[in-house]
Curated annotation (Swiss-Prot):
This is DNA-directed RNA polymerase III subunit RPC3. SUPFAM superfamilies: Winged helix' DNA-binding domain. The gene is RPC82. GO terms for cellular component: RNA polymerase III complex. Gene3D superfamilies: Winged helix-like DNA-binding domain superfamily/Winged helix DNA-binding domain (1.10.10.10). DNA-dependent RNA polymerase catalyzes the transcription of DNA into RNA using the four ribonucleoside triphosphates as substrates. Specific core component of RNA polymerase III which synthesizes small RNAs, such as 5S rRNA and tRNAs. GO terms for molecular function: DNA-directed RNA polymerase activity; single-stranded DNA binding. It is found in: Nucleus. InterPro entries: POLR3C_WHD, RNA_pol_III_RPC82-rel_HTH, RNA_pol_III_Rpc82_C, RPC3, WH-like_DNA-bd_sf, WH_DNA-bd_sf. GO terms for biological process: termination of RNA polymerase III transcription; transcription initiation at RNA polymerase III promoter; tRNA transcription by RNA polymerase III. Component of the RNA polymerase III (Pol III) complex consisting of 17 subunits.
Length: 636
């Protein structure tokens, strides 16, 4: 897939000549995201594109003359050529402004959408393929999406003209319609090439200047009225295009098809909904089990297209700096979780969309039967164990971890809810009562995977789930990298909000020396913040008390930057590996060598080629794992 994305920069020269130096250590450590996107640009589009992206990231918006001034080795013609390809791939946005003298200047901005499409390119194709069952449909959909990703956008007319003679035109046209209806392909518009913050400013100035100069309104009321009107226009421009303007009916075949000359591009927001569903399914599997997670996966699949976006576009306009606007946006997003059309479902909807090979019989047990088994087990057990202090303890008094977990989980549900948990005598493998039982499990646990808005009607509360998911992923990373002790102290600080070292000593049940060492490590990685509280009026440092707290924003931002650096470093090492073995790789890719490597290559060359391929695959697998964690803190 990287090869097809590399071909995307049609006019970008992918040359190895070292006109522009490779990423320096200073740049890599100064800004991890700059390091990441620069490496992605270099690996896919070449050194010149990487240099332009690096300048746009470091300096902000720039004109062509400013880019040439900062990178004289590129030249004006080369800069313009690179910008055309970057704009085509949605890696750069632009805005034309008029100066006081009347001169028009075009400024170019960095746009991360294009680079995220490159990072997820392989998984995007797999995600689209998963929407279809037939192999022919999967192949056609994959080819369409690959071409859209490689070119940035395309029209159905241009794609049809490039088809081979043995490909059915009607099947391809029908697939375009399906991809548009699923939301993966959307019409390309000027909004894709314009920064949202600048779009907001343009609309705001237009509305504000439209207010009569002799208006008696106060400035505060003028701004409030302007803001309200701007929001309406802003949301109108960004809302989904009406299908009537995209799809048409072919008069000859009476089939629906996409308009021939309408350029289509990939909808990254729709794909991220799919990634969000995948994250939540994995989270549910770890908390409530594989069978409820399977039910949850079906529920997410039938509602994810209608579900709200990962973030509100208004968040990118600067309105989040105002507390009232921030709270209003959060309330609107929470309301959209329940009120948007198509986001609610019931057990019948799940039953209708379950795979045919699913059998839910035996996956739930009635509470009455479980209590009988437990009482029988307790009645039969009369053995006694001797504890360390010499006390004899009955075996049935030592509850297992599973029993304690079951008890804690059941505390969150009412008796009426528990009555649904039975399957004795139910012969239907997709029984609605069984599905309802699993939905109750998902909605009554400590983590609200679902919320029952009305009896039998459920929805997914993304606004409540995302913070819990972030916390769970963050804790898992801390526990796996810094150890269980760090995770224990982190939870201790979080549970007590603001805590002293003495409280940690009493609750963490660890040695004081170990606690101080672990706290120092957590502070180093921004997992815990230190707050100095003076105890005297003169604020003497010797009498101050140091308390510890968790600032989730700082902790998550640091983790996001850390993961971004690791992704970039993985790509950087892979590119260095390819450069060091450039001669061997070029030789192995020759047409007369392909398929005959064992005959034409030396044994040492074969071993080296095997090593390069293995390291490249390992780097790619590492990058995919890091991306799955990075997206939790970056986009979800």
């Amino acid at each position: 897939m990287n090869g097809s994305m590399g071909a995307a920069g049609g006019q970008v020269e992918n040359e190895r000549a070292a006109e522009v130096p490779v990423s320096t250590l200073e740049m890599r450590t100064l800004s991890p995201e700059t390091f990441l996107y620069t490496e992605v640009a270099r690996s896919h589009l070449g050194e010149r594109a990487g240099r332009v992206i690096e300048l746009l990231l470091n300096k902000g918006r720039l004109s062509v003359s400013e880019l040439v001034h900062l990178a004289p080795e590129l030249g004006s013609k080369s800069v313009r050529t690179v910008l055309v390809s970057l704009i085509q791939l949605r890696c750069v946005q632009y805005l034309e402004e008029t100066t006081v003298s009347g001169r028009k200047i075009t400024y170019y901005y960095f746009n991360e959408d294009g680079f995220q499409l490159m990072l997820y390119a392989g998984d995007i194709v797999a995600a689209v393929e998963s929407q279809f069952e037939a192999d022919d449909a999967k192949e056609i959909a994959a080819q369409i999406v690959q071409n859209v990703l490689a070119l940035g956008s395309l029209t159905t007319k241009d794609y049809m003209q490039s088809l081979a003679s043995d490909v059915s035109v009607n099947d391809v046209a029908s697939m375009f319609v399906k991809l548009v209806e699923l939301g993966f392909l959307v019409p390309l518009s000027n909004v894709h090439y314009m920064p949202l913050a600048d779009l907001w400013d343009v609309l705001y100035k237009k509305e504000y200047n439209a207010i009569p100069k002799n208006s008696t309104l106060s400035d505060a009321k003028k701004r409030a009225e302007t803001k309200a009107k701007t929001k309406v226009q802003f949301n109108t421009l960004l809302k989904n295009v009406e299908m009537s303007n995209v799809l048409m009916t072919d008069m000859q075949t009476s089939m629906r098809r996409v308009q021939d000359n309408l350029p289509l591009t990939f909808n990254f927001g729709r794909y991220m909904k799919h990634r969000r569903s995948r994250q939540l399914v994995q989270f549910a599997r770890s908390r409530v089990g594989s069978v409820p997670a399977m039910i949850y996966k079906v529920a997410l699949k039938i509602t994810e297209q209608c579900a709200r976006a990962l973030s509100d576009p208004l968040c990118e306009t600067g309105l989040m700096q105002e507390l009232e606007e921030q709270l209003a946006i959060q309330e609107d997003m929470a309301l959209d979780d329940e009120k948007l059309p198509g986001v609610t479902f019931n057990a019948v909807d799940i039953s209708r969309n379950l795979p045919n090979n699913i059998d839910l019989r035996g996956t739930l047990t009635s509470m009455q039967r479980r209590s009988q088994e437990r009482s029988t087990h307790q009645g039969q057990s009369h053995k006694r164990l001797k504890a360390e202090d010499g006390m004899a303890v009955a075996v049935n008094h030592l509850a297992t971890v599973e029993e304690e977990a079951e008890g804690d989980e059941l505390l969150h549900g009412s008796d009426d809810d528990m009555d649904m948990f039975f399957d004795e005598g139910d012969s239907d493998p997709k029984s609605v009562s069984l599905i309802n039982g699993h939905l109750k499990l998902l909605s009554t646990g400590s983590v609200p995977f679902l919320i029952e808005s009305r009896p039998g009607l459920f929805y997914v509360p993304y606004s409540k789930l995302m913070p819990i998911l972030k916390e769970a992923v963050y804790d898992a990373i801390i526990a796996s990298t810094l150890g269980p002790s760090a995770h224990r102290i982190l939870r201790c600080v979080r549970d007590n909000s603001l805590v002293s070292e003495k409280v940690i000593n009493n609750t963490a049940l660890m040695r004081e020396k170990d606690i101080r060492s672990v706290i120092a490590t957590l502070v180093k990685y921004n997992a815990v913040d230190i707050l100095e509280v003076p105890r005297t009026a003169d604020r003497a440092a010797s009498r101050a008390v140091f308390l510890f707290k968790i600032n989730e924003k700082h902790a998550y931002d640091f983790m996001k930057q850390n993961l971004a650096w690791n992704i970039a470093n993985s790509i950087h090492k892979t590119e260095i590996l390819k450069e060091e073995n450039f001669t061997l790789l070029s030789k192995a890719q020759r047409d007369d060598v392909k398929g005959r490597e064992a005959e034409l290559l030396l044994p040492s060359e074969l071993n080296q080629l095997k090593m390069v391929n293995e390291r490249e695959l390992n780097g790619h697998a590492r990058k995919i794992r890091l991306l799955s964690m990075w997206e939790v803190f970056k986009m979800l």
